[in-house]
């Protein structure tokens, strides 16, 4: 394999594609397979160039002043001859310059132009800040003829490809991207003979979660796994040796009244969401420059829900019904989630291309899972944003309260157990914190990258309320007496986790809002080509995702309150660790694509991902 000539970070001069002009560039990286250098121009443009198009700075010598010209005798014209020339004849110099210009045009038109085409993904980027499409780049070669050429494009399916048109000028070059409609279209020549390129089909996008087979198994496996966990937890001995648990008849899992109660709960949260209370903020920019508006009233919805629940308890409403029909409620939520996912996919088929998610792929099964439309809305009602925090997260707290009351009734207690109080208090703090800092949700991957499909619908409406309340559900049938010294240690652990979690998130959010805040002047950063800075000190110099570390420490505290008799209550911390490690890998992939060399420097400065000195 030939050795590379230029090193990373070396400042050289690179030829602008399609011209003979060289500009000062910095070598970013080198691909040994394609033998292409990734370079960065002074204006921030990053391109891939061949080694022949790159020259060291020493090969360019400053030219002396003055210009080449004809001999002095030719420069000096005779005034008498000038006066005797026929007025109708053009000057000799004008004829010569016109001829030279014509020959230059011919040479310019016959020059072989090499343009690097970067095909866009078959869908827009939605809220993606980086605007990077994540697809490989390739080179198209063409010989430009003297006369204009017009070629037709054949496009497949719903996709639109990108043709690159170069308009070269002596001092100004620009690359224009023009979207080709699904029908045939012709280009009109402008200053230079315009070339149209036959764009080759884009290779299949790399899919997450194991691709189509992976998401297919997840969609069918997660609901089954959820019900097996709940059935195991209701057994007297939830040991793994007793797996699988006895399965109830299918007709016993469905009850229309339960489904009606769940719909009522969902509609109540919709009403609270639509109330004109709370401030309105703008989200991150979409691909077309729009910024959607969001009303931050999640905390108010929680207060109103608490008032409704308190009034219901005072009126004597029997909440034990939820515990005794817990499996039926889980099934009702699952059915509702599937129906909602079908609706979301069907409506996304008519959504404008600019409204599609950057995570979608064009495959029906995968897009049904990951979500095809980025921000599905009915008027001003944002379905994804609503489901992220309202029905599931607030429902989690309500279910915990139901389990606390069920423990008192089943175990004949005058007051709840200390373990149940710890679990309820810890998780209540977690939910209130999320609702109080609702605006931070607008910059998460769920909002700016993932569409709204089965993955988020099932996670928000089923997995969160019925799995995150698993410790409280476990304690109803398997009491655990926690001593006060042990409880004190658990509280300290929870407090440490919360300080890390909230401190890291608050620091990140404050820096995003105002990087020039004097209170943040002590923080060190790395500048990126996107214009943004990466924090490399404070909490974010400790690990790349210190908020994940705090989250996991808090999750461990929730599980410790359940004792050590069974591994079942520790399922949450095991699952949550796997979830955050996978999410960190997704973040790593997108940030590397977005920030490039700056992200590599950041990883050198902050080598640990989540667990300092471990991972």
From Swiss-Prot:
Does Iron appear among the keywords?
A: no
Mark the transmembrane ranges.
Answer: 212-232, 258-278, 299-319, 326-346, 415-435, 447-467, 481-501, 561-581
Spell out the SMART domains in the cross-references. Answer: TUDOR
Keyword Cytoplasm applies? yes
Which CDD domains does UniProt cross-reference here? Tudor_LBR
Which PROSITE patterns does this one have?
Answer: STEROL_REDUCT_1, STEROL_REDUCT_2
Q: Which GO terms describe its molecular function?
A: Delta14-sterol reductase activity; DNA binding; NADPH binding
Kindly provide the name given to this protein in its UniProt entry: Delta(14)-sterol reductase LBR
Organism from which the protein derives: Pongo abelii (Sumatran orangutan)
- What is the name of the gene encoding this protein? LBR
